[in-house]
Amino acid sequence: MRRLRHREVRGPVLGHTATGGPQNGTSGCTTAPQQRPPPGTQGMLEQYLNRGGQKSHGLCWLLCFVSQGQNQDVISAELWCRIHVQAHWGCWQNSAVWGCRNEVLVSLLAVGQGLPSASGGRLPSLVHGPSHPDSQHPREVPLAL
């Protein structure tokens, strides 16, 4: 009788799932967010992520203007937050992501008002005070989008 020296391990690595699923509500990694982007940006987001751009803040601006063109309106702050969380794959606690989100929301405000700063300029007084970016938790401002 022979004894096997090496046993093949089957199944997901501890802390991860093979494909994600309802058991932990993730898409393969336990730190990934559960939210999904709106249908209009789904294909574009997946294509971008497949090219390894999941950490790129440039995706924020890309999805911003794609959504503008498809919806003919300014998307809501809540919807934008869901897109942004999905794009950054769970790094919502990262202060750099907070800053990026604030910039995007400022730009969305500018788009809605027809201001030239929608092309990427900042209007910091609308979103955070002078303590940013040193602040760990930038002040939230209610947006009527």
UniProtKB/Swiss-Prot annotation:
Tissue specificity field: Ubiquitous.
Polar residues: compositionally biased ranges: 20-34
Biased composition (Basic and acidic residues): 134-145
Annotated stretches, region: Disordered: 1-41, 122-145
Superkingdom per UniProt: Eukaryota
UniProt-recorded name of the protein: Putative uncharacterized protein B3GALT5-AS1
